[in-house]
Amino acid sequence: MADLELIDCGGGRRLERFGAVVVDRPAPAADWLPGLGPSAWAKPGLEWARSTWVRGAARDPWTIRAGGLTLECRPAAGGQVGVFPEHAATWEWLGRAVAGSAERLGRPPEVLSLFGYTGGATLACAKAGARVVHVDSSKPAVAWARRNAELSGLAERPIRWIVEDARAFVRRERRRGNRYDGIVLDPPSYGHGTGAWHIETDLAPLLEDLAAISGPKPSFVLLSAHTKGFGGEYLGALVREHFGIAATGDDLVLRARSGLRLPLGGWARGPYH
């Protein structure tokens, strides 16, 4: 991914490049010394520290290319810029999974993309020919995803954009008897407000409902998480338990230019062959 690069990590921080912009932001897992010297870290275009952008907050949005998509980046809350680089490697797999499912089914697969954020996974599926339902509880995030669809030339693809709590949406789909061929979800550790999402207590019931709307067995499932204790092995076990399909899992890891490796969570997927 030429426009996405982890330059270095250490001291609880990560130095990344998104296109032409270098970003310095926290990485709690990077509890080691940086691999590069201070000069490499000296002049980032954006820097997040002490819960705010301390450098570059007024920067205009810019675009990058990743996975055949054009995506808009900009300074956002929580030190985010709109793209999770560690997910980019999964988009190619999603494209193949959609194509394989379409060939097997004889029609475009119906894909549900939950916690869809700014749309990377959603657009990877749509680009490959899927009919996609994109769900996120954040109205600004969904608007951002729609903007990315426009930038990527996918605005006219069959994508439904839903601003709603993922749990509520899936429960309603289950009551209605709707079915999906592919499931993609990247749940956060926790949400905010009354009845907010907590992955420790809410993921298993959500997977149970998802299994019911993708039965008897989905064409493919991709589950990822950034929560401590939810590594690839555990996520793979969850997919096997709830969907009854073979699943493999591994850690979400970025390798830095400096040679260091930064763990960022886990993923599990199956059964696309």
Label each region the model flagged.
Residues 166-242:
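S-adenosylmethionine
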Residues 131-136:
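Conserved SAM-binding motif I beta-strand of class I
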Residues 138-184:
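S-adenosyl-L-methionine
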Residues 85-106:
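Conserved alpha-helix/loop element of class I SAM-dependent methyltransferases that forms part
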Residues 217-273:
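C-terminal catalytic and target-recognition region of SAM-dependent MTase-like enzymes
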Residues 118-130:
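Conserved SAM-binding loop of SAM-dependent methyltransferases across substrates and taxa
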Residues 2-19, 23-85, 92:
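Non-catalytic substrate-recognition/targeting regions of SAM-dependent transferases
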Residues 106-117:
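Conserved class I S-adenosyl-L-methionine
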